[in-house]
Amino acid sequence: MKTSRRLLASLLSCAAATLPVLHLHAADFDVVVYGGTSAGVIAAVQAKKMGKTVVVVGPDKHLGGLSAGGLGFTDTGNKAVIGGLSRDFYHRVWAHYDQPIAWTWQKKDQYGNKGQGTPAIDGAQRTMWIFEPHVAEKVFEDYVKENQIPVHRDEWLDRAKGVKKNGARIASITMLSGKTYTGKMFIDATYEGDLMAASGVDYHVGREANSVYGEQWNGVQVGVLHHRHHFGAVTSPISPYVIPGDPKSGVLPRISTNHPGVYGAGDTKVQAYCYRYCVTDVPENRIPFPRPDGYDPKQYELLVRVYDAGWKETFGKFDPIPNHKTDSNNHGPFSSDNIGFNYDYPEASYERRREILREHETYQKGWLYFIANDPRIPKDVQAAMQKWGLPKDEFKDNGGWPHQIYVREARRMIGHYVMTENELLKKRPTPESVGMGSYTIDSHNVQRYITPEGHVQNEGDIGAPTMGPYEIAYGSLVPKKGQADNLFVPVCVSSSHIAFGSIRMEPVFMILGQSAATAAVMAMDSGIAVQDVPSAKLREHLLKDGQILELPAPAPKAKKK
């Protein structure tokens, strides 16, 4: 009896000792998706629908990226180009709001139905383009549950030594936790492109000079003032100095003293990030704007001068989403965009990125608190802001604050084909379309500087129309051959800074995620490199799945007699 007990104890001890090791053994899948963004979830769903084993692994605790992180006022562009699973997402949103129970804080017929270039609710097409964050997150969670896709959350790629390759193919990726994932195909669906970079793939950070790809809107854009996110939008020039007009008094916070650069030149700077914060004016659901830790009212001295110079558009991008809430975006010369404080984010360590995120959160929460409480704010603006607050029923585990910052741009792959403004403007045809984009060529401000005249000004904000919807090349999803022959990159796509300004919209990321997964399965089944997937067969499959690869050319205008 004692011998049996000793044997049992010994076996249990051995089992306990081996459990952690088993936990860290490689998990093998056909397709490994790194990143739980909208593109990542859609890519995983497509791979599973095509009969493959797939896992979504990444740092995310919440699925859906920006689509579930506050960006509910969708950058739709031309909705006719949104097909496949991307369109299905917006159909599922429509189905949710088609139920009376979804309208918690207002009746459906009281909602204004405003969208970006399209009605929010498109009953004829059974789609809805505007939504609350928690609704989007539920749709993404439903996708993985329905398709029985495992999701491994809060797993961070070991960027230094976690990518193992056999020649030009990725064999496995290992997380900082020690967990390893082997796969036949890999998809980097992160906003940062961490897997892409760690795999030895070429990429770029910042703006290329216009001369690199023969563009107009890339590079430094000193003197170009689009939209109203610049200091020309107020009635008089604003001094950047602590004592107006006196350089010796020092420069106000959040203004760079560096030269902005020469028009058209490249740099390594990144367009501004912000949180797409959601607010509500329903008293029962409203959390007053909190005073953040580290709050410093001096950081907003420039904002006081903006109001003194006649700014009256504080609420210009409090865009309405259902149930008396907003998707709130940057608007104006000094707003929620934290200009100049994200330059090192794309390449930064995880710890440094956390510092950047904390600084952005402090700045943006402080901006709201300052407007709602500082006595120097115009009384009408302050009274209006005090009617708003963070919603109790959104981002419940984060005090009503979004869990995902808007990484508008980080790394961009330099891949098999580089998309530029020339394809978007129809100056050059796009080969092998795998989806379409249509949104305006859009970059937010990159820097805030002092002009030669001694005034403060912003630089980098661009809003230029495309020549209608445009195709996106398959080659922009894959690296150069020989660098990573089983990797797809549907978010940090191969494109110039300014082309990415239009491509970078959430509906397009979902389109490209589905196309990437389709091609990944085809490459795997044929035993070929991702760069060698036959275009005609891929096109056939994408069309069968409802993807839109081109629109009919407009009829030529009749000649005047």
Regions found by a protein language model. Give the residues of each.
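Beta1/beta-strand and adjacent pyrophosphate-binding region of the FAD-binding site
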Residues: 27-37
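Flavin (FAD/FMN)-binding glycine-rich loop and adjacent Rossmann-like elements that form
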Residues: 137, 171, 179-185, 189-560
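Conserved N-terminal/central alpha/beta ligand/cofactor-binding core
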Residues: 52-53, 58-162, 204, 212-214, ...
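Bacterial N-terminal signal peptides
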Residues: 9-23
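N-terminal secretory signal peptides that target proteins for export/translocation
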Residues: 1-5
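Aromatic pocket-lining residues of Rossmann-like dinucleotide-binding sites
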Residues: 47
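Conserved beta-strand-loop-beta-strand element in the redox core of flavoprotein oxidoreductases
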Residues: 161-180
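N-terminal Rossmann-fold NAD(P) dinucleotide-binding loop
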Residues: 40
